[in-house]
Amino acid sequence: MSSLSETMIIGLTGGIASGKSTVVEMIKEAGYKVIDADQLVHDMQAQGGRLYRALLDWLGEEILLSNGELNRPKLGQLIFSNEEMRQRSAEIQGTIIREELAAQNDYLAKKEDIFFMDIPLLIENGYQDWFDQIWLVAVSPEVQCQRLMKRNHLSVEEAKLRIDSQMSLAEKMPYASLVLDNNGSLDDLKEKVKSAINDLTSSS
């Protein structure tokens, strides 16, 4: 729940390759601010950023490209290679990410009546208490796997490994105030998002 009663904060989440980014763009087009956790992480993993320094201290220079930037594909392979590595990554990066998200949350809560936070691992990382509502973008495992393979140029095995590293859709459902089914067309999704925003503004 948001700390400022007059401000409504909505958490947006969904599995990898669920189409959440498309929903974010629709929300932005409707005029709402969205804090993007993935972009925040990307910025902090840039050369010299807080996460860049933390990852370099942990894994050493083998995760760097020749120009000094992070080798993101190699980093992903290392982290997703086993559960111990994934948990250690979550510990190291999670604290820093939470601090940065909290700062952005506090800033927008002073300026906006309604805003969104796009956090892929919102439930897995225990962010649910931050929000007045949680919107979950949902797709079938088959659609999710196909989209992830195409988007990230992964094999079936690699895609399933990344999907299986996250909480399942069934486990996330009880936390959701609203489920946006994205197994259909783009137009179907637009209508669902438009309806959800209309309901939001009419009740606020």
Descriptions of predicted regions:
Residues 2-32, 37-39:
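Walker A (P-loop) phosphate-binding motif
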Residues 89, 116, 180:
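Residue-level signature of catalytic and energy-coupling elements of molecular machines
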